[in-house]
C-alpha cells in the first residue's frame, strides 16, 4: 500500500540552515562533493562520500549520459519607466512579432502603455502591452527583430544580466560563464540545469575515454523554476509546461545503449519521460511542451539512474527524486548531507543515484 504521506506536500518539508545554501561555485567544477546513495534497506549513514570526479569510477563503459544543452539567457533587465522609476524585467518566452512574456518587479508599477528604457541605453525602448493573468507577468514589445531566443540573445548579452536564483546573494561577472554548462548550446533558459554545472572539460574527456556515451536533449528551464508548489494534495498537482526537444539521435542513442541510461539533472528526466509519455510510454522523438508530474508512484519508462543537486523543500524536484528512491530515504539522506556540511541548491553539491539503488517497482521494464 502506498504511504498517504507521499502525496502530501507538507511531507516534503525539511529544515535547512541558511549557511548551507551555496553562494558561489567551487573550482574546478568536478571538485563539488558527491553523496552516493546507498542501496535500499541500508541506513543513510552508510552513504559514500566523494567528489563529482568519482563518476569516472561510478559510470561504466556503455553507459549513456543524457544531458540538457540549453543555454541560459542574460534575461534580467534593469529598465526605467517613463516617470523615471527603476524596475526589473525577467524575459521569459517569445509570443510572436517581438512580443515577450516577462516577469516585472515591482509588477504593480508596470502598467499597459508604459514606455520602458533599458537602463544604461538611450536607444532601446520597450512598451508594456498587457498584463498576463496566467503568469502574473507582462507582455512587452521588444524590437521586432527579437523574434526568438536566438535573435534576442545579442541584445540581452549587451544589456542584460544572468538571472541567478533569488537565494544566491551575489553579482559576479564570472557567473556569465559559471552559470552555464560546458556543453550549453541552444539559448532559451532563464535558469541553468544545475546538475550539469559539475562537468568540467577534463571530466567529460575522461568519461568519453572510458567509453561512456553522451546524448543531448534540450529543455528550456522556464518560469516554473521560480514558482513553489502550493498544492497540499499532490494528487491534484499540476505543473508548468516547459519546451523540450528530444531528437531522433537521442532516441537512437537510448535504443543502442549497451549499459545504463543516466539522466544528468531533473530536466533531463522530465524531457525523456515526457517524450515517452507523449507516445504511450515508448520513447520516440518529440518536440513541444511537457507538463509531466513525476512523484512517488510514477513508473519510469526510460531513466535508470540520476545525477542531481540538492533541491528546495516542498519543490516539484524533490518529488521527482523521491519517486526514484522513496521520500523517507531521500529526507534521511538530506539530513545526513546537512550534518556533513554539504552545499545545497544551484551552486551546491550533488547526489548520485545509481540504477541499483532505485526502487525496483519504479524501474523501467526491460
Curated annotation (Swiss-Prot):
Pathway: tRNA modification; tRNA-queuosine biosynthesis. It is an enzyme of class 2 (transferase). Keywords: Cytoplasm, Queuosine biosynthesis, S-adenosyl-L-methionine, Transferase. It is found in: Cytoplasm. Its EC number is 2.4.99.17. It catalyses: 7-aminomethyl-7-carbaguanosine(34) in tRNA + S-adenosyl-L-methionine = epoxyqueuosine(34) in tRNA + adenine + L-methionine + 2 H(+). The keyword S-adenosyl-L-methionine applies. Its main location: cytoplasm. GO terms for molecular function: S-adenosylmethionine:tRNA ribosyltransferase-isomerase activity. Transfers and isomerizes the ribose moiety from AdoMet to the 7-aminomethyl group of 7-deazaguanine (preQ1-tRNA) to give epoxyqueuosine (oQ-tRNA). NCBIfam families: PRK00147.1 (NF001140), queA (TIGR00113). HAMAP family: QueA. Monomer. This is S-adenosylmethionine:tRNA ribosyltransferase-isomerase.
Amino acid at each position: 500500500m502506498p504511504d498517504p504521506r507521499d502525496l502530501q506536500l507538507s511531507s516534503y518539508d525539511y529544515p535547512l540552515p541558511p549557511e548551507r545554501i551555496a553562494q558561489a561555485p567551487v573550482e574546478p567544477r568536478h571538485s563539488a562533493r558527491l553523496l552516493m546513495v546507498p542501496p535500499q534497506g541500508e541506513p543513510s549513514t552508510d552513504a559514500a562520500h566523494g567528489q563529482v570526479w568519482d563518476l569516472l569510477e561510478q559510470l561504466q563503459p556503455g553507459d549513456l549520459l543524457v544531458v540538457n544543452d540549453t543555454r541560459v539567457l542574460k534575461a534580467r533587465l534593469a529598465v526605467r519607466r517613463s516617470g523615471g522609476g527603476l524596475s526589473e524585467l525577467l524575459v521569459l518566452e517569445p509570443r510572436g512579432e517581438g512580443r515577450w512574456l516577462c516577469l516585472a518587479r515591482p509588477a504593480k508599477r508596470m502598467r499597459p502603455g508604459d514606455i520602458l528604457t533599458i537602463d544604461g541605453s538611450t536607444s532601446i525602448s520597450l512598451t508594456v502591452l498587457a498584463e498576463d493573468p496566467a503568469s502574473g507577468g507582462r507582455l512587452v514589445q521588444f524590437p521586432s527583430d527579437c523574434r526568438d531566443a536566438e535573435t534576442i540573445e545579442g541584445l540581452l548579452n549587451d544589456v542584460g544580466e544572468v538571472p541567478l536564483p533569488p537565494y544566491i546573494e551575489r553579482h559576479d561577472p564570472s557567473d556569465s560563464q559559471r552559470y552555464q554548462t560546458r556543453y550549453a548550446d541552444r539559448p532559451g533558459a532563464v535558469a541553468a540545469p544545475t546538475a550539469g554545472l559539475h562537468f568540467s572539460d577534463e571530466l567529460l574527456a575522461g568519461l568519453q575515454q572510458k567509453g561512456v556515451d553522451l546524448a543531448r536533449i534540450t529543455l528550456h528551464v522556464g518560469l516554473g523554476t521560480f514558482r513553489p508548489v502550493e498544492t497540499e494534495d499532490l494528487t491534484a498537482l499540476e505543473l508548468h509546461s516547459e519546451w523540450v526537444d528530444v531528437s531522433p539521435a537521442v532516441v537512437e542513442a537510448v535504443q543502442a545503449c549497451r549499459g545504463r541510461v543516466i539522466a544528468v539533472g531533473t530536466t533531463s528526466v522530465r524531457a525523456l519521460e515526457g517524450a515517452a509519455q507523449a507516445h504511450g510510454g515508448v520513447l520516440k522523438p518529440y518536440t513541444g511542451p511537457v507538463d509531466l508530474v513525476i512523484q512517488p508512484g510514477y513508473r519510469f519508462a526510460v531513466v535508470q539512474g540520476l545525477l542531481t543537486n540538492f533541491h528546495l523543500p516542498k519543490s516539484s524536484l524533490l518529488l521527482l527524486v523521491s519517486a526514484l528512491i522513496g521520500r523517507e530515504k531521500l529526507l534521511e539522506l538530506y539530513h545526513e548531507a546537512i550534518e556533513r556540511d554539504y552545499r545545497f541548491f544551484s551552486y551546491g553539491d550533488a547526489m548520485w543515484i545509481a540504477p541499483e539503488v532505485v526502487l525496483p517497482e519504479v524501474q523501467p521494464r526491460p
